[in-house]
Amino acid sequence: MSQVARIIVNGEPREVPAGMSVAGLRAQLNLDKAPCAAEVNRTLVPLREQATTTLRDGDVVELVTLVGGG
């Protein structure tokens, strides 16, 4: 098994440790403190599942931070 997973994050290629969770990716990108929607392979990953959803080689991830204002 490969030690890295080659994934796409918001349109950019990225290598992450094999088995990294969506929550781990958010932490690596400093997005773990802000509200953030996550989608893996066009499927929404609820916040409660982000720590247990692991990333695999070839996954396409979209992370969208939520910003309020008016």
Language-model-derived ranges and their functions:
Residues 1-69:
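Ubiquitin-like/PB1-type beta-grasp interaction modules and other compact soluble beta-rich domains
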